[in-house]
């Protein structure tokens, strides 16, 4: 078999007159009575092949048996297309190949999905036949971008003298974070490894080991409830460095991301990226990952509410809550009462008891709550919300977390419905100065806002023992277009500070020693100050490739129920395997 001389999508007018050897899949076959045209596809694109009896009767006879997705080896001569046959929508649209020989390398059954970007197959069918779905050009282009992003990051970190180091996949289960995936040990009866949720502890230990600059394209595993932008196994760009300040880490990541955007996406973004404190992000956008491509910020009306005539507003503030509103500019005529009822139900999903609203008309405020406000109060509302005739004002009165969650989500929904978002923009943002701890009322304890190894501000270390809720973290998240790309922090590197952190999280001294004794001991041998960041590769590629589903950026992803439709994993295992692991199943009864 002759070697391939050209990729299908790379045959251009420069090759006219040449004999070429092509190999690929049949995208489409057209029989025009005496002539057969085949679109031959490989990962670079499509070229038109013509089977003409005047060129080769034998090749034409074979072509008559060919169907879509057959794998072919074609030999032929490149010729220019006639004027009326030129297709400027194809890179190869000015030429075609006159086939002299064709060899069917493999036949194909009729495929269960259409191999085209506009396939009508459901996602379940696409996942079951993922190897066919991956043939679609849009899928290949997504994974080409993933490769380009990873390559650019590796090259950048190499120039910055980072070492790529692999850390263990079989490790120890720790109590913080999401549920672990557990792996039973055959050698140690009744004991389990855990698959890593991140390489956090190992990368810190590499800093203890004097490596100074580490990175890894790391596989991570979390047994958590899934959604469109979550998978049980995912990939993160894991980075750690010694002796760098927070500003130095952020500046380096900005240089890396501007290079990724330019090299992998062809888009110039400017640095430094804007920075916003966590408290400001929550106050202005109701989100710790604000989408700054459009405005519509939350406005605090709590002071106004104290003296207003609407008791719902007044009582919310008196009970320690707040009143906030958003102004959907020019949207009054676009939302009927029924539409606003739908927005109300949407807000309730996020804990709001209801959604108050007003429409601004030329002669004043209209709506169910307009009667509660006199002329002076109406003017204050209009001024605070920068309202004009035609605007729709939406209010939530509740505890602070509910106000932020509901109005933040409502803001995003309205941004999409009103087409306020410029989809061509890439808005990066650093969210800094996070709270170190978050209190969970159900569990009646504090949890780490990021993880238990995050360094507090130096002046806040003592607050861990006196007022943990006031302690701030030297932590930072990188946000792109309303998605958290990744998070990082400076790390605790002194044993006494780490022990205070564990105590604030409710660990007894014995529990801390049992779970993290190896780390605490490491901190006694001259641990350098260090910090880092982990960026979600799957999510970054999703945003750059313009996909809406994380599964489209992972070659063989899981469904929302964490199953693989292709291999049918997870699956039962043989009784003998369980016995070898000293395991016995106790299945939950179906309700």
Curated annotation (Swiss-Prot):
Family annotation (Gene3D superfamilies): Bira Bifunctional Protein, Domain 2, GAD-like domain, Nucleic acid-binding proteins
Residues binding ATP, per UniProt: 222-224, 231, 484, 536-539
PANTHER family in UniProt: ASPARTATE--TRNA LIGASE, MITOCHONDRIAL, ASPARTYL/LYSYL-TRNA SYNTHETASE
UniProt xrefs under PROSITE patterns: AA_TRNA_LIGASE_II
Keyword Chaperone attributed: no
Binding site for L-aspartate: 176, 222, 450, 491
The entry's keywords: Aminoacyl-tRNA synthetase, ATP-binding, Cytoplasm, Ligase, Nucleotide-binding, Protein biosynthesis
E.C. no: 6.1.1.23
Pfam families xref list: GAD (PF02938), tRNA-synt_2 (PF00152), tRNA_anti-codon (PF01336)
Catalytic activity field: tRNA(Asx) + L-aspartate + ATP = L-aspartyl-tRNA(Asx) + AMP + diphosphate
Location in the cell: Cytoplasm
Lineage, top ranks: Bacteria, Bacillati, Bacillota, Bacilli, Bacillales
GO biological process, alphabetically ordered: aspartyl-tRNA aminoacylation
Location of region: Aspartate: 200-203
Subunit note: Homodimer.
The family this protein is said to belong to: Belongs to the class-II aminoacyl-tRNA synthetase family. Type 1 subfamily.
Species of provenance: Bacillus mycoides (strain KBAB4)
Protein name: Aspartate--tRNA(Asp/Asn) ligase
Annotated site, Important for tRNA non-discrimination, chain positions: 84
Annotated GO MF terms: aspartate-tRNA ligase activity; aspartate-tRNA(Asn) ligase activity; ATP binding; catalytic activity, acting on a protein; nucleic acid binding; transferase activity
One cellular component (GO) term of this entry: cytoplasm
UniProt function note: Aspartyl-tRNA synthetase with relaxed tRNA specificity since it is able to aspartylate not only its cognate tRNA(Asp) but also tRNA(Asn). Reaction proceeds in two steps: L-aspartate is first activated by ATP to form Asp-AMP and then transferred to the acceptor end of tRNA(Asp/Asn).
